[in-house]
Structure formats: structure tokens, C-alpha cells
Regions:
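Short, charged/polar connector segments at secondary-structure boundaries
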Residues: 1-77
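A short acidic, often aromatic-flanked loop/helix-cap motif at beta-alpha or helix-coil junctions
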Residues: 79-81
Length: 81
């Protein structure tokens, strides 16, 4: 799987996941990203006209906090039903 750059505003975050945001962790990650760059891409899957976050909530929020417009992501397959 290749890493791709995705516009942050095209990534959907389900409401229940928003409750999992840890402001202290987001701040620490933002500082780390400023110093070293994003070391581990987030994971998303394709949804209807957008991407859905699979993994990397705190990293995504840190990128938003830094004012970034895009984020490096790995696009994974949809879950099997």
C-alpha cells in the first residue's frame, strides 16, 4: 500500500470518535510533528464521496492544530460484511 496525501477536509470523523480526542496528546504530537514530521501515516478507507478515518485520530487532530491542509494516509480496504 502506498502513502497518499489527502485533504484533511475530505476525511470524515464519526461523532463517537470525537469523544476520544485527548487534547494533551494532540498537543504533544503536534510538537513532535513540528520537530520530526509525521512519522506514521493515518489510515483511512474510502467512503461515499470522502474518506473515513480508520486509525490515527490524535495524529489527524495534531495536523489540524498545526493548520495543515493535507495529511499523509494509507488507504485501506473496506471491512468485510
Amino acid at each position: 500500500m502506498d502513502d497518499v496525501s489527502i485533504p484533511i477536509d475530505e476525511i470524515y470523523l464519526p461523532a463517537k470518535r470525537r469523544a476520544e480526542i485527548d487534547p494533551a496528546r494532540v498537543e504533544a504530537l503536534a510538537e513532535s510533528i513540528l520537530e520530526e514530521g509525521l512519522q506514521v501515516p493515518i489510515s483511512v478507507r474510502k467512503g461515499k464521496g470522502r474518506y473515513v478515518l480508520v486509525a490515527g485520530l490524535q495524529r489527524l487532530e495534531a495536523m489540524k492544530a498545526l493548520g495543515e491542509e493535507t495529511v499523509i494516509a494509507i488507504v485501506v480496504g473496506s471491512p468485510q460484511h
